[in-house]
Amino acid sequence: AFLLGKICTQAGLPNGVLNIINGTGPSVGQAIVEHPNIKAISFTGGTKTGASIARTAAPMFKKLSLELGGKNPNIIFADCNYEKMLSITVKSSFANQGQICLCGSRIFVEKSIYSKFKNDFVSRVKELKVGDPFASSTQIGALVSKPHLDKVMSYIDLAKEEGGEVL
């Protein structure tokens, strides 16, 4: 968002046409949604938060754009450019620790290449450098919070309970 703002300014967009404001939802986000002079809200994130925004903004007839609860699949066919697909699939699964709405959270693979893909994907993921998020060599850093870590771990536990295998 910050870079988008810089690009728009460099392109000559007048000040005040696009405003990018960073902050936490309960303080900054709530103030933006409730402000009577803000006529449009765009939000990408969780469904629960989106519903809260809609409840507040809709009676004020604000324009709303809500992109909620993404479950983006990677769909992989046998005739793809295999190396390019593998690189993109690893990146799309683990960019920003998998915590952004654009990350692939599911992978559908054509049966004829499933075994090869599974082995190659796991091998590439194991090569990712886990470490300090401030180190330039780190490819996988920390999750955003302890509650988020607990949520991720609960999904892993659930997968195991349902017969899944951690690769």
Task: State where each predicted segment sits.
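ALDH superfamily catalytic-core signature
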Residues: 40, 46-167
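Short, solvent-exposed polar/charged micro-motifs at secondary-structure junctions
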Residues: 28-32, 141-144
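Beta-loop-alpha module in the N-terminal Rossmann-like domain of NAD(P)-dependent dehydrogenases
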Residues: 25-31, 45-52
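Short, well-ordered alpha-helices that flank and scaffold nucleotide-derived cofactor binding pockets
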Residues: 6-10, 34, 55
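Glycine-enriched alpha-helix->loop->beta-strand junction motifs that scaffold or abut catalytic
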Residues: 35-41
